[in-house]
């Protein structure tokens, strides 16, 4: 079974998959399925693409990097040895205490030796250098551990101890003590050297979280501990991916510094020397890894930047600044709005979201738009235009071209709605399924007048009367005149005009007159309701 999980996931959320029986094939599958750690995936994919593009320079840089590591590890030393020498100091302290409290009793000496052996073996396993780990993993050489050495020493000392009396045995033990002390010192020196040369120690420490020691009571350690607790409480997926890089400075060494200074130079040389085919390979790799967690995290960080967010909205999704909505001016015949003192809050029903049909009825009731004089059809004369009770309703229809399908009323989420009121982006119902106006209003024109299509690009820019190659959007204007009937004398000025159930009816498609082709509009059935808000 393969255990694949992220650093930020708890133990109970680890994913298990069945192994194929081959370690190399399992690693390849984990990298391709993005279940391995992110640096394994990125380094493997990047190294594979470089091998395909430039095998010689890639192999040369790889060999140079490995030679740098294995040749400079003998001379490089850590900057801070306090954390790295804790294990060796603990071993030396335990060895001194065991020497001082040693007795000729075999039981007590065996217990101390067992404790010391376990400690040294654990430290040797944790502080094993990277080259020795590779040897042990692939070739698995036979290495002499401290346990076998102790057994050999006991076997060599047992004949001399058995044939002598107690004082002689004590003397023999005293004689062997210096050799044991020298062996302990030698092991401590080897542990120090292994700790300095340990690549696995660097890699494993980068993958772990920094643990603040509770021994010291200084303010710096307390503040660091509180900071780590705050980070743990707000630990996100992006923090898990960037965790090795965030904690890199805490394990800074000359080897890391030189390597990460040497690596960008080589990478910059390779990047500037890449031809067009390499650029195509890089773009294809980005396309293949688009849904991978690391790339999504990088894109999420880029979109949070205001400059890139502005470019993304302007050139990718075509989001522009919405025009200012015109302030509706109340008609002279309409009653004034009630003041704040006389206005009583309605307790009958909560506020409901306006539907497109309800919004259209309100637009008809208080439309500030008057018929323009440049319209040739259905225009008003000077005598008629002077009548303040006559107004004109303008609606804008938007459509988008879909490759292989044609022009459809379905638009993108960033596009304007299918039908909007002129000068705003509020959605309204389709004109072919419009209701009769509410009480107090009446249509002047029997049919809707439709202007020709205006073609624009995918960002609703560059308008043109004829369709061009990159015209993926179009819009046209629907207009119809209506008259506002003066209120009756016996009617209260604030009579509700929203009850339109008695005057609801659908108009047929033959009421529409166009100057060009009219797209087939869907006639929506209007259910019976007590008001326009139920639409």
Curated annotation (Swiss-Prot):
Which residues are glycosylated according to the annotation? 374, 377, 409, 418
Question: GO terms for CC?
Answer: cytoplasm; peroxisomal membrane
InterPro entries recorded for this chain? Peroxin/Ferlin, Peroxisomal_PEX28-32, TECPR1-like_DysF
Membrane-protein topology: Multi-pass membrane protein
Give the compositionally biased regions (Low complexity): 339-349
Q: Which residues lie on this side of the membrane: Peroxisomal?
A: 1-31, 284-535
Q: Give start-end positions of Pro residues composition bias.
A: 325-338
User: In what ranges is there compositional bias, type Basic and acidic residues?
Assistant: 97-111, 180-194
Any idea where this protein resides?
A: Peroxisome membrane
- Mark out the compositionally biased spans (Polar residues): 142-160, 496-522
Membrane-spanning ranges = 32-52, 263-283
Q: What is its main location?
A: membrane
Give me the ranges of the annotated region Disordered. Answer: 87-115, 142-194, 323-353, 482-535
Query: Which keywords are on file for this protein?
Result: Glycoprotein, Membrane, Peroxisome, Transmembrane, Transmembrane helix
Example GO biological process: peroxisome organization
Q: Which residues lie on this side of the membrane: Cytoplasmic?
A: 53-262
Q: Which PANTHER family match?
A: PEROXISOMAL MEMBRANE PROTEIN PEX30-RELATED (PTHR31679:SF2)
The similarity annotation says:
Belongs to the PEX28-32 family. PEX32 subfamily.
The protein's name is Peroxisomal membrane protein pex32
